[in-house]
Regions:
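Conserved SGNH/GDSL esterase-like catalytic core that processes O-acyl groups on lipids
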Residues: 68-229
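Bacterial N-terminal signal peptides
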Residues: 11-20
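Catalytic nucleophile-elbow at a beta strand-turn-alpha helix junction centered on a G-D-S/GDSL motif
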Residues: 53-69
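Mobile gating loops/cap/lid regions near enzyme active sites that modulate substrate access
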Residues: 255-327, 331-383
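Bacterial Sec-dependent N-terminal signal peptides
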Residues: 19-50, 406-409
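Histidine-centered active-site loop/cap adjacent to the catalytic His
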Residues: 80-84, 370-409
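A short helix->loop->beta-strand "cap" motif at the edges of active sites that frequently abuts
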Residues: 236-240
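Bacterial N-terminal signal peptides that target proteins for export
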Residues: 2-12
Length: 409
């Protein structure tokens, strides 16, 4: 028996004919009933639970849940993939690291954490790691969250506990909290047989530029080839995915400020033993505040000139440097978004957090408050706080909802 479907304004199926139809066997066949509007969100949530039934994350410190240059269970639970899974109501295993963590997250104020000097631009966690606590009891590896602090795309594809041990015992310890021997993020992801994968693997290719070493960024073509190999592995699983892009403008980064803003704080800086040259007022340069300010504090009495030494780790960026960084991020974002569209995957960018308006710059707040870079950024000036991670989780949910027609709260 055939049903003929019309498209009434309410958008549900309508049958031509009577409210019930008698089949050739004499049975009464009831027509399909429209879905009540109040039931549709529940059905969409059920669909999202199917989509994300086995949700696996590839990524960097932003996905792992690093806060204040350390990773521990509280930050891991707050990471945007974990928040996304919780909103969708799906299981999501996290390789939770016991207190005090790997490295123990720094405690405020920023002024007391001169240990950060020289660590910026690389993996903050392993750079200052003093201890790496074991996992909480009962956790089986690999878990759903495979993201590792400091990972570049090439690390996700190639790096194992064993390969990292040849470079850094600290990094090997961190990898051992996430992966089994011989595994990479990508091989562990494939082994998990995911239904959905998040891929956030672009930030660490650009991060060295925050110190002023713009030439230390990973070349776009090198990153692209590795990134595409990772996406091919994701595609091979048949899973859905959300790809994560970079911020749009490095100058909007919460811990990057104009030299003139820095100059305007000269009375407070002078009280700390830092004289600020008038050159800062006239300069068009930008300063990566955590590194620049902590370095000055370690040398007091001293004078800040806001001058740039090309490709030196001086935490000074010229306007030209910002343009170069933004050009690379734009190229990477365009490629990530293109690959997402080609594969029918969702896409959002870290711009949802890092391009938000910044709070007013006050050196006293930066050095001595609990939130030196605003409520959304942790003490290190780089990684999201729990509130910042919630912003990313919302951006991810909106992107997935739009692409897959589901309703993740």
């Amino acid at each position: 028996m055939k049903y003929f479907v019309t498209r009434p304004g309410l958008g549900f199926l309508a049958l031509v004919g009577a409210a019930s139809v008698v089949s050739s066997c004499g049975e009464i066949v009831q027509p399909p009933r429209p879905i009540a509007p109040e039931q549709r969100p529940l059905l969409n949530l059920a669909t999202s639970q199917s989509l994300l039934a086995r949700f696996v994350s590839l990524g960097t410190s932003n996905s792992q849940g690093v806060q204040s240059a350390g990773v521990a269970a509280a930050g891991q639970r707050a990471a945007w993939p974990a928040q996304l899974a919780q909103r969708a109501g799906v299981p999501y295993d996290i390789p939770l690291i016991q207190i005090p963590g790997c490295n123990p997250p720094l405690i405020p104020p920023l002024a007391a954490n001169l240990v950060l000097i020289g660590a910026f631009g690389d993996d903050l966690v392993s750079a200052i790691m003093t201890t790496c606590a074991p996992l909480e009891p009962g956790i089986a590896l690999p878990a759903s969250n495979l993201a590792i602090s400091g990972a570049k795309a090439r690390d996700a594809l190639h790096s194992t506990i064993e390969s990292e041990a040849l470079v850094s015992a600290r990094k090997a310890e961190l990898y051992a909290r996430v992966l089994l021997p011989g595994q990479t993020q990508v091989t562990a992801m494939v082994a998990k047989q995911p239904t959905f994968v998040s891929v956030e693997l672009a930030a660490n290719e650009v991060l060295p530029a925050s110190t002023g070493r713009v030439a230390a960024m990973t070349p776009f073509t090198e990153w692209r080839a590795t990134y595409d190999a990772i996406l091919n592995a994701v595609k091979g699983t048949g899973a859905g995915a959300v790809l994560v892009g970079l911020p749009n403008n490095a100058a909007n980064f919460p811990s990057i400020r104009r030299a003139r803003e820095f100059y305007n704080q000269w009375p407070y800086l002078l009280a700390l033993g830092i004289s600020v040259s008038s050159k800062c007022y006239l300069s068009s340069n930008y300063l990566f505040i955590p590194g620049y300010l902590l370095t000055l504090l370690s040398k007091t009495p001293t004078t800040a000139t806001c001058a740039d030494v090309p490709d030196a780790a001086d935490y000074v960026l010229t306007a030209g440097d910002i343009t170069v960084i933004n050009s690379q991020m734009a190229a990477m974002n365009a490629h990530i978004q293109t690959r997402a569209n080609e594969n029918g995957w969702a896409y959002f960018s870290l711009s949802a957090l890092y391009d938000l308006p910044k709070p007013a710059f006050r050196v006293v707040d930066v050095l001595f408050s609990n939130t030196p870079f605003g409520a959304n950024i942790s003490l290190d000036g780089v990684h999201p706080s729990a509130a910042g991670q919630a912003i990313l989780a919302t951006a991810a949910a909106q992107a997935i909802n739009a692409k897959y027609g589901v309703t993740i709260p």
